[in-house]
Amino acid sequence: MSQTEHHISIEQEMRKSYLEYSLSVIIGRAIPDVRDGLKPVHRRILFAQQELGNSYTRPPKKCARIVGDVIGKYHPHGDSAVYDALVRMAQDFSMRDPLEEGQGNFGSIDGDAPAAMRYTEVRMSRLASEFLSDIDKETVDFRPNYDNSLEEPIVLPTKVPNLLLNGSSGIAVGMATNIPPHNLGELCNALLKIIDDPDVPIDNLLNIIHGPDFPTGGFIYVGQGLYDAYTKGRGTVKVRGKVEIEERKKGAQSIVIREIPFGLNKSSLVEKIAILVNERKIDGIADLRDESDRKGIRVVIELKKGVIPEIIINALYKFTPLETSFGINMLAVVDNRPQLLTIKSALTYFLDHRREVIVRRTRFELNKAEARLHILIGLIHALDHIDEVVNLIRSSSTPAEAKIRLIERFSLSEIQAQSILDMRLQRLTGLEREKLEEEMHELQTKIAWYESILGDTKILWGVIRDEVTGIKEMYTTPRRTEVIRETLTNIEIEDLIPDDDVVITLSRRGYIKRTNLAIYQQQRRGGKGVAGLHTSEDDFVQEFITTTNHQFLLLFTNKGRMHQLKVHQVPEGSRTAKGTHIANIVPLEKEEWVTTILTVREFSDNKFFLFATRKGMVKRSSASYYARSRRTGLLAVGLREDDELIMVKEVTNNDFIVLATAEGFAIRFSCEDVRNMGRGAAGVKGIALRPGDSVVACLILQEKQDTPAIMTVSNLGYGKRTSIDLYRVQTRGGKGIINFKVTQKTGLVIGAKPVSDDNALVLLTSTNKIIRMSVDEVRSAGRATMGVRLVKLDDGAYVVGFDTVDGTVDDSCDDATINT
């Protein structure tokens, strides 16, 4: 037997097969039809329910029964896909106007899964019945099902503009659709407008259709994005949830979320808020709980006392899905091809569909009426000659003979003759004759009406208008999504925070807080100001900066990294509060701590930072290099092995730099000796250290600063103040001069600071004791001296740190504030 071989190109075959697959997905699965707004699975579900009699007037049926009929007769796919579609059609948070009425667990807005289909029951909603109205009147075409055993409708003869009413979303091959739901009343008004004026501009329709109307409510911001979506088919709109502010006892307030954006999982939103609170990205929330019930959504966010609720609301919109973007892509199947639609074209295609349905329905009704009228004419004619008809029938030997004789004698059609033969004897009464004549006149009136519809376009559109008006009056519900006619701009949190003067304090143990400066100013009028300078008995303030809320706060660590945040992001604390550990605000590595904090309002090329390291390196860099930062921090200075950053200061060319070492040496040089270098540079040598020595302090002496002396303190409690004039200016990189006579008795130098006579000194020991004294109690001495004993230490104890404060210190420590 001969065989015929056909050689085909694999490239052509793959192109052909992929195109067929793509069209199958587009037309048969993922993209809705512009006429009824349904995908095949939804259309088959509704038709199967129609065939089962599962209407809104009858008791619901098990979902398993519906799903079984759909996959067995029309939709040869998995049962889960059909059940998921059926469930979604019953969810009032997924569909603007649900097409199913469900009984049982059909899932929730929290993302809970529905119960198994064997437990749930469903029936079509009253609105869904309008999708199938007149389907038995040849209004739409049918096609064979997948095994040619039954027929299914290609499209439903819906009276409802479902494509825009409930919207649709789906992903096909190389394309996707995402159409938002709308308000039925607005859609019907737009349809009526197009019926009255087919050439109406789209802009006029936009005055009728105000925007999407989501089942979950919320706010929608109408701007260019929505205009593009309605006029071009693609655009993006901003959607926000709706919140309220409630007053609580003792002046506290709560934020209550009542509506959320469409498609958002409520439990995921609550979880996201909780995560942000734990990560301290949103501060000021005391409690968070979900009080939602069958009456609606209610997520309560209790605020701490004194927190401005508008700030938290803005943070929720900024950091959580409470504000989302809805991308509109109005793609639908038109004449078996995907097409991008405008709002007007979508409505026009629906009206064209309604016109075709009404024309086909009218023709069906006309044919039916004419057929019935034809029979009635024959029956009435027979009644006019009833005696002759009866005799003719009685004299005939068979029904077939009687039919032929009736046709020949009275010029009847076969249908008329058969109707006469089928007529019951009771029809021979006079009353029945009157009924037949009355029915004939009614049919003649209907036929005239049907013919007028088919013959007059105005009458046809009048019928469509009446049906649209009826749907509007029957099913319209109030708008749920509030439209705000303005483009949403991202409001920064700073816009809601006043740029007040504040104080940032960082303790030696790493606790940081932000306090309003007015509290310290009030305290100086009679309170114990020093109470605001330490966080606990074993800690004291290391950094104290007066700044404003809107400035940038730069935190430099010993490992040479910089973290950047806004001042207002530092948690606020009272004057006596301990504060928040810095590790809870910025990520720190093991054995890493913040050594210096600076604040700047802008990162100018003319502003410079000076960096000093433990190994005597110094670097001057432009502040503009540090304008950007990352979540994990930014490399601020390149450190060599076993080196660490000890201080960063803002400097000018006129400043002088003093480096002090642990072995008691110091060097003073001009800032101009340190050239401007890049962010990752290690710097240049500031002082040549002797073996085993290290830098413990870096002082910036401003040209006009009134600090006549340098206070130097050792770890065994000795200290002295020395006039700045005794430190001559040297060349950078030298070994320096003696600053402090280090002996076994004094121990090593732990630090040095510029002071004046009206300053006070605060020392912290290893046994957690804090000692305070006035600077003028420490006698002035030369450079090559060891000073005096500042504190008597217990055996094994040592001084771990010290700082200076403005104001003398008496027994009550009144009026003392940290030296800035």
Curated annotation (Swiss-Prot):
GO terms for biological process: DNA topological change; DNA-templated DNA replication. The active site is at Y119 (o-(5'-phospho-dna)-tyrosine intermediate). The keyword Ribosomal protein does not apply. Keywords: ATP-binding, Cytoplasm, DNA-binding, Isomerase, Nucleotide-binding, Topoisomerase. It comes from the Bacteria. It catalyses: ATP-dependent breakage, passage and rejoining of double-stranded DNA. One of its GO terms (cellular component) is DNA topoisomerase type II (double strand cut, ATP-hydrolyzing) complex. The keyword Plastid does not apply. Pfam families: DNA_gyraseA_C, DNA_topoisoIV. It is an enzyme of class 5 (isomerase). A motif (GyrA-box) lies at residues 523-529. Its EC number is 5.6.2.2. GO terms for molecular function: ATP binding; DNA binding; DNA negative supercoiling activity. A type II topoisomerase that negatively supercoils closed circular double-stranded (ds) DNA in an ATP-dependent manner to modulate DNA topology and maintain chromosomes in an underwound state. Negative supercoiling favors strand separation, and DNA replication, transcription, recombination and repair, all of which involve strand separation. Also able to catalyze the interconversion of other topological isomers of dsDNA rings, including catenanes and knotted rings. Type II topoisomerases break and join 2 DNA strands simultaneously in an ATP-dependent manner. Belongs to the type II topoisomerase GyrA/ParC subunit family. Few gyrases are as efficient as E.coli at forming negative supercoils. Not all organisms have 2 type II topoisomerases; in organisms with a single type II topoisomerase this enzyme also has to decatenate newly replicated chromosomes. Heterotetramer, composed of two GyrA and two GyrB chains. In the heterotetramer, GyrA contains the active site tyrosine that forms a transient covalent intermediate with DNA, while GyrB binds cofactors and catalyzes ATP hydrolysis. PANTHER family: DNA GYRASE SUBUNIT A, CHLOROPLASTIC_MITOCHONDRIAL, DNA GYRASE/TOPOISOMERASE SUBUNIT A. This is DNA gyrase subunit A.
